[in-house]
Regions:
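N-terminal, membrane-interfacial amphipathic/helix-forming hydrophobic leader that caps
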Residues: 1-93, 116
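Hydrophobic alpha-helical transmembrane segments
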Residues: 9-13, 17, 62, 97-102, ...
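Residue-level recognition of pore/gate-forming positions within transmembrane alpha-helices
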Residues: 65-69, 104, 180-183
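Small-polar-interrupted transmembrane alpha-helices in polytopic inner-membrane proteins
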Residues: 161, 172-188
Length: 188
């Protein structure tokens, strides 16, 4: 393996590690602050941290996702890991936007059908947590805008961009596949 590829893969690993560490730290800080604000003592907080119920209410989850997304976005943009420019928007890509909306809407029915066929059930704790979060009006902006924006900056802006520099144009599909696998792995 040449030095350029090794350096690029290390950089991708750093991006991934930073993104995960931000999530872990923000989860702990937001969870502990929330439990302290609710009047829990230290031993109850430790119990909640170990049993996974630290981020169980909708407001706390919403705050966690918002802070996590904002911190990750700011860090990756400010460090230059995910360069942002207006050149694409200045090209007025209205046809692309139109087709994205049409294709997104067009996938709803097939995905609903596939969901019914597979009968995949979400874990009860996850279902309760997201149901509680979606009762918060701001959660739609957090889950629909902030979180996807942060993930795009990390996985496409930093990770995929770096991987694409390591592959010949003919093999860009390898970089895209690696980025997709990393994205899926982070999402469990």
């Amino acid at each position: 393996m040449n030095k350029k590829i090794a350096k690029g893969l290390v950089q991708v690993g750093i991006y991934l590690l930073v993104f995960i560490v931000i999530q872990i730290v923000v989860m702990q800080v937001v969870g502990i602050c929330s439990l302290l604000a609710q009047g829990f003592n230290a031993s109850e907080i430790v119990t909640r941290m170990t049993d996974g119920s630290m981020l169980s209410d909708g407001k706390t989850l919403c705050i966690f996702f918002a802070i996590n997304a904002v911190l990750a976005s700011l860090l990756f943009v400010r460090r230059g890991w995910a360069p942002v420019s207006r050149s694409y928007l200045q090209s007025r890509p209205w046809a692309v936007l139109f087709w994205v909306v049409i294709l997104s809407l067009g996938t709803l029915i097939p995905f609903a059908f596939i969901e019914e066929l597979t009968d995949v059930q979400m874990p009860e704790a996850t279902l309760r947590a997201f149901s509680a979060m979606l009762r918060e009006p701001v959660s739609y902006a957090v889950l629909g805008v902030l979180v996807p924006l942060a993930e795009e900056l990390v996985f496409r802006g930093a990770i995929l961009r770096t991987l694409l520099t390591l592959t010949h144009r003919r093999y860009h599909w390898v970089a895209i596949a690696i980025s997709a696998v990393l994205f899926a792995a982070v999402h469990g």
